[in-house]
UniProtKB/Swiss-Prot annotation:
Organism: Listeria monocytogenes serotype 4a (strain HCC23)
Catalytic reactions on record: (6R)-5,10-methylene-5,6,7,8-tetrahydrofolate + NADP(+) = (6R)-5,10-methenyltetrahydrofolate + NADPH; (6R)-5,10-methenyltetrahydrofolate + H2O = (6R)-10-formyltetrahydrofolate + H(+)
Name assigned to this protein: Bifunctional protein FolD
Assembly and oligomerization: Homodimer.
Transmembrane segments: none
SUPFAM superfamilies, alphabetized: Aminoacid dehydrogenase-like, N-terminal domain, NAD(P)-binding Rossmann-fold domains
Entries under PANTHER family matching the protein: C-1-TETRAHYDROFOLATE SYNTHASE, CYTOPLASMIC, C-1-TETRAHYDROFOLATE SYNTHASE, CYTOPLASMIC-RELATED
Primary gene name: folD
Length: 284
């Protein structure tokens, strides 16, 4: 029976560490600030942004929310981002995705100052990640690495398989595992004999967006299984990309959905914001 990796507990521990560090900085008259830009009225985005704000404030940081209508022009949005780039009280900028179709996500991400790009999506940060330089790492992949390390497992020398090749999770998590000296395979929908490939993994990260996609026959006995999915099953119940009940017997460690990867994402955003603030103050 696999041991459950408790993402809520780990996220709380990391958040407490960030909060303590922020409190020390506030004593010196320094307060990290995070600005979130929300375009339109997507309910899921709104809920997620509210969560980010609440957690930012709990950590003792300045939290700014800028709301823009669905029909805002690209030009207007870019000028808002440029103003935040110049704002000395803001150290992290996040534009909540997805954006309306008439706005280029690429342009918006490129406009965010890479020193304040706490989502880790700016090409400079992506490039730094790939050459192994210190950079802002996308929050979900950063959280995944912390979850794996929390099991006490040495990543170095392990076989890791990542199912999914998105720019937000799959590719960066594969690169992070490589930077930790794992031997990494990226698999995807076109991979032949996928269960066979997955079964070689000591560490399996699943980010397919397909409910209960990974079954027991994908799992090497004792493997660490990280489920990035957030789906609904046939009964409309929240589930992951891994069929938890089927896989839990084979796995050594496994993240649940909910309560695994999800809680880590906002925590790593706070850690990135703190890092951004410290970097900016150091440069100045």
């Amino acid at each position: 029976m696999g041991e459950i990796i408790d993402g809520k507990k780990l996220a709380k521990e990391i958040q407490e560490k960030v909060t303590r560090e922020v409190a020390e900085l506030v004593k010196e008259g320094k307060k990290p600030g995070l600005a979130v830009v929300l375009v339109g009225d997507n309910q899921a985005s709104r809920t997620y942004v509210r969560n980010k704000q609440k957690r930012t404030e709990e950590a003792g940081m300045k939290s700014v929310l800028i709301e823009l209508p669905e029909n805002v022009t690209e030009e207007k949005l870019l000028s808002v981002v440029e103003e935040l780039n110049e704002d000395k009280t803001i150290h992290g900028i996040l534009v909540q995705l997805p954006l309306p179709e008439h706005i280029s996500e690429e342009k918006v991400i490129d406009t965010i100052s890479y020193d304040k790009d706490v989502d880790g999506f700016h090409p400079v940060n992506v490039g730094n990640l790939f050459i192994g330089k210190d950079s802002f790492v996308p929050c979900t992949p950063a959280g995944i690495i912390e979850l794996i390390k929390s099991t006490g497992t040495q990543i170095e020398g392990k076989r890791a398989v990542v199912i999914g090749r998105s720019n937000i999770v799959g590719k960066p998590v594969a690169q992070l595992l490589l930077n930790e000296n794992a031997t990494v395979t990226i698999a995807h929908s076109r991979t032949k004999d996928l269960p066979q490939v997955a079964k070689e993994a000591d560490i399996l990260v699943v980010a397919t967006g397909l409910a209960k996609f990974v079954k027991k026959d994908y799992i090497k006995p004792g493997a660490i299984v990280i489920d990035v999915g957030m789906d609904r099953d046939e009964n409309n119940k929240l589930c992951g990309d891994v069929d938890f009940d089927d896989v839990v017997e084979e796995a050594g460690f496994i993240t649940p959905v909910p309560g695994g990867v999800g809680p880590m994402t906002i925590t790593m955003l706070l850690a990135n914001t703190l890092k951004a603030a410290k970097r900016i103050w150091k440069m100045n």
